[in-house]
């Protein structure tokens, strides 16, 4: 499924505000504002997605406990159509504006981007570092590939991509593609599809890791 280009849907510029305040000390999500924006674009011509997808925002600091990670996790919005996806994407700060160690996630349904969630515990991620000047393009391309189900033919028939994340780091940013079952990762060619979509990008430190292999899987940080 190819996702149509973004419509021109932006916040009222007279408001001088955004649904998300990306200051380092307080990242606030105005869910009501996003609700108003998405409702404005939904009509009988909306193009439904194959499944709903939920945007999440969080900030992960070294030494953070599982409970703290969970409490720092903020749901932004669940999108059901191409139009609602673009209305959210266009009206939250670009990843380049997020503070250090903040992350955006887009997860299938309303599953949370936590390793130990029942729906995620058997899965894992393809993880790679991205040059900062390429992060915006990579994140957008992966989002579109994900909601367009472009990884379906590159996963094992018993598996699927269930999310994608981008995390702001000091030198290079990190992107991750989540799948539902780590035991089928060797049968997948998700990385091959990413390289096809982004042939101009020089990814670094590319690898796959099951969630259960993280040292913090049972008691420390419950996410990347």
Curated annotation (Swiss-Prot):
Organism, as annotated: Danio rerio (Zebrafish)
Residues annotated to bind mRNA: 115-116, 169-174
GO terms, molecular function: RNA 7-methylguanosine cap binding; translation initiation factor activity
Alphabetical UniProt keywords: Initiation factor, Protein biosynthesis, RNA-binding, Translation regulation
Protein family per UniProt: Belongs to the eukaryotic initiation factor 4E family.
Quaternary structure, from the entry: eIF4F is a multi-subunit complex, the composition of which varies with external and internal environmental conditions. It is composed of at least eIF4A, eIF4E and eIF4G.
GO BP annotations listed: regulation of translation; translational initiation
GO CC annotations on file: eukaryotic translation initiation factor 4F complex
Descriptive protein name: Eukaryotic translation initiation factor 4E type 3
Gene name, Swiss-Prot/TrEMBL: eif4e3
Known role: Recognizes and binds the 7-methylguanosine-containing mRNA cap during an early step in the initiation of protein synthesis.
Region (Disordered): 1-23
Biased composition (Polar residues): 9-23
